[in-house]
Amino acid sequence: MGARRTGRERALQALYQLEMATATTAEALESAWSAAEESNKRDPDAVKFARELVEGVQSHRDEIDQLIERHSHNWRLDRMSRIDRNVLRLGIFELKYRPDIPRKVSINEAVELGKNFGNEESSAFVNGLLDRVAVALNKP
């Protein structure tokens, strides 16, 4: 698995933990890495990318959540599963604040996170919502 995919997975786990318990970003990331099988061989690029994602989502969370609310049809943020909500946050952060990551990559990676961590409807839900957000943001 590549460094960025690993970083995204750890970022998702850390964001999930930050919603569940009082923890700092560093504590949540450490917990995510410790729980992972490959914790003995942490790729420095994956660690850095995960930290950038979590810190970015946390600092832009209000804006990101507004985009989720605006583009989710008949779903309130608080009714979404924690996994779906945080996958969407990661995807939107990449779409809006990481111009170095192509739209297709951001959406596909978020869909994969939905498949791997969410329920059977997560990937389609994530794909549809992120596509609407990308169009609204004029992300090529």
UniProtKB/Swiss-Prot annotation:
Q: What is this protein called?
A: Transcription antitermination protein NusB
Q: Which organism is it from?
A: Myxococcus xanthus (strain DK1622)
Q: Which GO terms describe its molecular function?
A: RNA binding
Q: What is the lineage of its organism?
A: Bacteria, Pseudomonadati, Myxococcota, Myxococcia, Myxococcales
Q: Which domain of life is it from?
A: Bacteria
GO biological-process terms attached to the record: DNA-templated transcription termination; transcription antitermination
Family to which this protein belongs: Belongs to the NusB family.
UniProt signal peptide: none
* Keyword tags: RNA-binding, Transcription, Transcription antitermination, Transcription regulation
Task: Give GO cellular component annotations, separated by semicolons.
Answer: cytosol
**Known role:** Involved in transcription antitermination. Required for transcription of ribosomal RNA (rRNA) genes. Binds specifically to the boxA antiterminator sequence of the ribosomal RNA (rrn) operons.
